[in-house]
C-alpha cells in the first residue's frame, strides 16, 4: 500500500491493453507476400498437418498466417490479404489468410459457410 506522499510523487498508471494482432497496426486487414508455404503440427491433444504461410506484410512485419479450408493454391510470392484471429492449437499463429481475395482462391465445392471461404453462390 503506497503512502499519500508516494501517490503525490507519481500517480497510479492505468493498465495498458495490448493488441492481440500488432502486425495489423490497427487496420482491419493487411496485404502481404508469402515467403514460405508449409505445414505444421498442432499442440498436444490434436494431430494434423495444418497449412500455414509465412507472410511479409506491407507494415514491415513478417508473420505466420493460417490458410483455412480444404486445399489451396498458395505458393511463394503469392499476394494475400490477412486478418486477425489466432489458431488455438498452433502456437505463434495469430493471423488468418482471407480466401477469395487477391491470389488466394476460394475453397472448391464449398456450399455451406461460403462467405468465410470466398465462394460465390452456386447457380
Curated annotation (Swiss-Prot):
Transmembrane segments: none annotated. The keyword Secreted does not apply. Pfam families: Ribosom_S12_S23. It comes from the Eukaryota. Residues 1-27 are annotated as: Disordered. CDD domains: Ribosomal_S12. Residues 1-20 have a biased composition (Polar residues). Keywords: Chloroplast, Plastid, Ribonucleoprotein, Ribosomal protein, RNA-binding, rRNA-binding. The keyword Transcription regulation does not apply. GO terms for biological process: translation. It is found in: Plastid, Chloroplast. One of its GO terms (molecular function) is rRNA binding. One of its GO terms (cellular component) is chloroplast. Belongs to the universal ribosomal protein uS12 family. Part of the 30S ribosomal subunit. With S4 and S5 plays an important role in translational accuracy. Located at the interface of the 30S and 50S subunits. This is Small ribosomal subunit protein uS12c. It comes from Zygnema circumcarinatum. The lineage of its organism: Eukaryota, Viridiplantae, Streptophyta, Zygnematophyceae, Zygnematophycidae.
Amino acid at each position: 500500500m503506497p503512502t499519500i506522499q508516494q501517490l503525490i510523487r507519481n500517480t497510479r498508471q492505468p493498465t495498458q491493453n495490448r493488441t492481440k494482432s500488432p502486425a495489423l497496426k490497427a487496420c482491419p486487414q493487411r496485404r502481404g507476400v508469402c515467403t514460405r508455404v508449409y505445414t505444421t503440427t498442432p499442440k498436444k491433444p490434436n494431430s494434423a498437418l495444418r497449412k500455414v504461410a509465412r507472410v511479409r506484410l506491407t507494415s514491415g512485419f513478417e508473420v505466420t498466417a493460417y490458410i483455412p479450408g480444404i486445399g489451396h493454391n498458395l505458393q511463394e510470392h503469392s499476394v494475400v490479404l490477412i486478418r486477425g484471429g489466432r489458431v488455438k492449437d498452433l502456437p505463434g499463429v495469430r493471423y488468418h489468410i482471407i480466401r477469395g481475395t487477391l491470389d488466394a482462391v476460394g475453397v472448391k465445392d464449398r456450399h455451406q459457410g461460403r462467405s468465410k471461404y470466398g465462394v460465390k453462390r452456386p447457380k
